[in-house]
């Protein structure tokens, strides 16, 4: 497992820096006046929300992992920031419906099996005119299987390993000494994978329009993590179906429900 995935406070701070430098400027492309009510679904420790809170936004984070929510509350309190954090399935929180001008969904979509159902459900939490910022790694990119969470140094640093056929991939994970929960999580990600084409099909089938899209050859978050300068994916590579997935380490979307 790469160190930042075990040091959650470091992970929080890295997320906050990337959000301030890249996510917020991207969102401001369509929302020059930053929305005041911000929800993050799958917020983890809350690092993405911290920079919004620093700008005076009212932030709410929801995650099914109670441990992550406890860490979010702790990290916010230690930094004197205000935020509401709830350990729950978002779709059980009817009191939050129609409240948020901005919803963040960062590195979550690739973990969800019913992507269309998830996207459709998100609409209930948007205020009129609200937007959703969605970011995810394309499945076929070098670490699209999240193998960096593995405990084995070989597995966690091995690009494209997740593209092996399922029985072989599972066998390699077991041979590398991964425990059952880690194997189960990595195999589940393989099942719920998110190629660009699959995501866009779910998006259009649930009545969203794309306000903006940017594919990245080098994920902006890699600057914080590895010191690599972000690189956008341009030209034919960005529009070639399937092929672009191998080169898109992060896919940014700003979307809204269709009017009418």
Predicted segments, located by residue:
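Short glycine-/acidic-enriched loop or helix-start segments at secondary-structure transitions
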Residues: 49-50, 71, 114-115, 143-145
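S-adenosyl-L-methionine-dependent methyltransferase catalytic module, highlighting the catalytic core
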Residues: 116-121, 131-256
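Conserved strand-to-helix beginnings and helix N-cap segments that scaffold or border functional pockets
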Residues: 97, 115-116
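A generic structural signal for alpha->beta connector loops
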Residues: 56, 82, 129, 207-210
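Helix-to-beta-strand junctions that scaffold the AdoMet/dcAdoMet cofactor pocket
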Residues: 112-113, 126-127
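Conserved N-terminal segment of class I S-adenosyl-L-methionine
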Residues: 1-98, 102, 106, 246-253, ...
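A short His-aromatic
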Residues: 107-111
């Amino acid at each position: 497992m790469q160190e930042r995935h075990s040091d959650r406070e470091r992970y929080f701070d890295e997320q906050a820096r990337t959000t301030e430098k890249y996510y917020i400027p991207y969102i401001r492309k369509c929302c020059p006046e930053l929305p005041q009510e911000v929800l993050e679904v799958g917020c983890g420790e809350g690092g993405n929300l911290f920079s919004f809170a620093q700008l005076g936004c009212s932030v709410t984070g929801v995650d099914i992992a109670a441990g992550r929510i406890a860490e979010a509350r702790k990290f916010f309190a230690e930094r004197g920031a205000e935020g509401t954090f709830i350990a729950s399935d978002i779709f059980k929180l009817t009191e939050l419906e129609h409240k948020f001008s901005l919803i963040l969904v960062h590195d979550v979509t690739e973990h969800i099996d019913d992507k269309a159902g998830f996207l459709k459900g998100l609409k209930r939490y948007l205020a009129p005119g609200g937007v959703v910022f969605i970011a995810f790694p394309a499945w076929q990119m070098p670490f699209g299987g999240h193998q960096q969470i593995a405990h084995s140094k070989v597995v966690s640093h091995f690009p494209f390993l997740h593209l092996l056929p399922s029985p072989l991939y599972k066998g390699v994970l077991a041979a590398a000494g991964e425990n059952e929960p880690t194997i189960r999580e990595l195999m589940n990600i393989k099942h719920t994978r998110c190629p660009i084409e699959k995501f866009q099909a779910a998006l259009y089938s649930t009545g969203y329009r794309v306000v903006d899209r940017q594919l990245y050859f080098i994920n902006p978050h890699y600057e914080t993590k590895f010191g690599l300068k972000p690189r956008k994916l341009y030209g034919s590579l960005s529009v070639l179906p399937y092929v672009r997935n191998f080169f898109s380490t992060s896919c940014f979307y700003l979307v809204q429900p269709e009017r009418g």
